[in-house]
């Protein structure tokens, strides 16, 4: 029990330290409109905050990228991902000893991003999807440790996300109806 408790403590302390570190980084950010802030000290856009989620954009962001990034981050807010991801991390911290929990948390983070991408691009043209994919690739973050709270634009499974974006087809009415019928049965 003490080893398990130490593991939980380490993961929760890591979360707290990460939170404080990010909070310090965005302290000097400038509000540009609504809940959107620009910051010189970050390299990738993300959402931060649980009670009052804010979108933080790096100052290096080009004007053509802003539209896609803000659409993506606003989709996270509408989906309440800023609440789900920390909750998932707490579950991960409690069940850290189970290797399937590590896998589940990684897949959970990937699925959050892919669901958000689908929500953003569902009515877009092929050209808009291509532009979105290029922006996503420009923010790809490689070799990162498991993150706690921020929902970063290029955080997880970029190759798979880009494939999903470029091959996305809106499901037909009949497919959705069949899936609902299957669930009822």
Model-derived features with residue positions:
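Membrane-embedded and juxtamembrane structural elements of multi-pass membrane proteins
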Residues: 1-185
